UniProtKB/Swiss-Prot annotation:
The gene is prfA. This is Peptide chain release factor 1. Disulfide bonds: none annotated. Belongs to the prokaryotic/mitochondrial release factor family. It comes from the Bacteria. Transmembrane segments: none annotated. It is found in: Cytoplasm. SMART domains: PCRF. Peptide chain release factor 1 directs the termination of translation in response to the peptide chain termination codons UAG and UAA. SUPFAM superfamilies: Release factor (SSF75620).
Amino acid sequence: MTQPSAIDDILAEHAGLETQLADPTLHNDPSAARRVGKRFAELAPIMATYRKLESARADLTAARELAADDASFAAEVPELERQVDELEQALADLLAPRDPHDGDDVVLEVKSGEGGEESALFAADLARMYMRYAERRGWRVEVLDATVSDLGGYKEATLSIKSRDAARDGVWSRFKFEGGVHRVQRVPVTESQGRIHTSAAGVLIYPEPDEVAEVQIDESDLRIDVYRSSGKGGQGVNTTDSAVRITHLPTGIVVTCQNERSQLQNKARAMQVLAARLQALAEEQAEQEAAAGRASQIRTVDRSERIRTYNFPENRITDHRIGYKSHNLDAVLDGDLDALLDALGKADREARMAAE
C-alpha cells in the first residue's frame, strides 16, 4: 500500500503548482516559469496513476456491494482487485526515491584514448550513436566543441543534449549510465594486415543545471581566453577571435566552445558546460561513499576500466557491469539503445531496492 502522507504531499504540491501556472505574473520570471513547469511535468505520471487507482478502487467497492445482492456481479471482483493491486504497485514505484537529476538535460563528452587514430574514429562513432538515439527521441543535439583527428575522428568532443519538453524522465535518466571507458575490437581502417585491434574511448556525462546561476561560480576564479575558431575552410568558418576557453582555476577544469557565431554566445555556452561540471564535481565530493547511487565515471581513459565492449567481428555488444550481451552492434551504433538502457535502468532499480 502507498503511504498516505506521501501521496497527500504530492497532491498538495500539484495543486500549488496548478495555482502558480494559472497566475499570469509567473511568466514575468522565465526562470521560475520553467522551474514550475518542469516540476508540474514530473508529477504528471504520478497524478495520472493516482486518478486511475482511485477510479479502480471506486469500481471495486461498487462491484463488491452489487455482488452482495446479485451473485452475477461477483465475477467482476477478481479482475478489479488485480487492477487495484497493479495500480497500487505502479504508484508505489513512482513515489519511490529517485535520482533528482532524472529530468535534466546533459552535457556529454567523448574522448579518444589508447589506439591513436582508431580510438578517435571510435570516439566519433560513439558520438554519432548518442546523436542518433537523441534524434529518435526528438531531443536537440548541439556540438559545442570538437577536436577532429586527421581521419575525421574525434580526439575529443562536447555535446549538449536537451529534451524539447519538460518530463519526469529526461535525457539524464537515459544516459546517466554511459559514463566510463568503452572498448572496441575491430580491424582499423589503418590496418593493412587485416588484424583485429583493441582500443578505447571515454565518455563523461553531466546533468546540466537549468540555470548557470544555480551553481555558484566566482568570476575571480576564472581565466577566460579568446582565440580564432578552427575549421576546414569555406564560407562557414568564423575568422574572428570568437572561440572561448574558460579555465576554472581552483579545480583546473577547462571548457572550450567555438561553434556559436559570436564570442558572447560561445562564452554563455561554455559557462553552461562549466556549471554542469562543477555541479557534478561538488556532488561527487559530497557523496564519495555513495558510489552506488550513480555510475562511476572515468578520469583516465584506460582499457582496463572498461564498462562496455563493442566487438565488430561478432557484431556483439557486452556491458560488463550487468552482463548484458546482444548481437546487434550495428543497430546499437545506429542509435537503437533502448534495450540496453532499459536493462541498465532495471539493474540500478533492483540494486537500490536490495540496498534499502
